[in-house]
Amino acid sequence: MCKVQYEMTPEEAFKEVIKVKAFVKGGVTISGGEPMLQPDFVASLFKLCKDTGMHTAVDTSGFILNDKVREALKYTDLVLLDIKHINPEKYRILTGKPLKPTLKFIEYLKDINKPIWIRYVLVPGYSDDEADLHNWAKFVSGLKNVERVDILPFHQMGMQKWKELNQEYKLSEVNPPTAELISKTTEIFRSYGLKV
């Protein structure tokens, strides 16, 4: 259960964005949780941003694709997308969800040629198998709308959130990846022509 501090309409959020627009070079990125659980909000806020020439990005798992999400994507310049694993069984172990919806989302982004930055969470013992890394890189290298890949080394900073939610944190014993593992993963991804 989330503790909502306050709620904002897209118009109220846009007023906050405008206050800092002169001080930042980038645009607006909506992340979460999962922003596409509120696609009407994303579409409305991004439309306001686009009307003033601001760049828009959404950070998503790509698990949800429906007409409202497609509408939100019309006003989205860039999608930051997590593909946590390419093996469906291992993806389910890592996320608790099936991979297929995310693959459908990726296919849609490919069809509309929407620019993507892919995020790969490197979790020792879960997403660091060399054969899986090659399969992942081979898949991603076939997506011509992928502009770059970011390797996100696993960390334990989210552990407290799980405690507050009274949920079991299955990765509590996992250590962050070593510099060597990050370097090896980077080399594998680059060997497929990916910009890392």
Predicted regions and their residues:
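Conserved AdoMet/S-adenosylmethionine-binding subsite of the radical SAM
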Residues: 11-157, 161-164
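Radical SAM enzyme core and accessory elements
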Residues: 191-196
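Short glycine-enriched, charge-decorated loop/helix-capping segments at active-site entrances
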Residues: 2, 92-98, 166-174
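A structural motif corresponding to the C-terminal lobe/cap of the Radical SAM core domain
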Residues: 138, 147, 163-188
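Catalytic cores of large soluble enzymes that bind and process phosphate-bearing ligands
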Residues: 5, 128, 177
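Canonical Radical SAM [4Fe-4S] cluster-binding loop centered on the CxxxCxxC motif
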Residues: 1-7
